[in-house]
């Protein structure tokens, strides 16, 4: 059973480009992770401080490995002080 993840990150208004760069740097290494099916980064067209990842993972284990990866840990450090709040990360299963 695959898992879907929606992760929302809110940049501080004066830190949008720094947040965008930090998040963009996650895309390539994450897409190459074992178990990653989809990993897309979106930016809200009406609110440029609002970023969202839409993800699909083959298993809970693959998602857990992703969360523990070096590039995720490094990005968490980079985001300290430049985001409004902790990321809102929600995990879903597909119903239909």
PLM regions and their residue ranges:
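Short, well-ordered beta-strand segments in beta-rich or mixed alpha/beta enzyme
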Residues: 3-9, 40-67
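Long, charge-enriched, surface-exposed interaction segments in small proteins/subunits
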Residues: 56, 67-84
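Alpha-helical and His/Cys-centered functional microenvironments
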Residues: 8, 70, 94
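Glycine-rich beta-strand-turn "strand-cap" elements at beta-sheet edges
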Residues: 41-49, 77-96
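Short amphipathic alpha-helical segments
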Residues: 15-37, 71-74
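Absolute protein N-terminus
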Residues: 1-2, 96
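Beta-strand elements of well-folded, non-transmembrane domains
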Residues: 11-13
């Amino acid at each position: 059973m695959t898992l879907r993840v929606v992760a929302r990150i809110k940049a501080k208004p004066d830190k949008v480009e720094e947040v965008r760069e930090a998040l963009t740097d996650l895309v390539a290494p994450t897409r190459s992770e074992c178990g990653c099916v989809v990993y897309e980064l979106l930016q809200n067209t009406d609110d440029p401080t609002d970023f969202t990842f839409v993800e699909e993972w083959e298993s809970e284990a693959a998602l857990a490995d992703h969360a523990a990866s070096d590039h995720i840990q490094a990005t968490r450090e980079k985001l300290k002080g430049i985001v409004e709040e902790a990321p809102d990360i929600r995990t879903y299963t597909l119903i239909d």
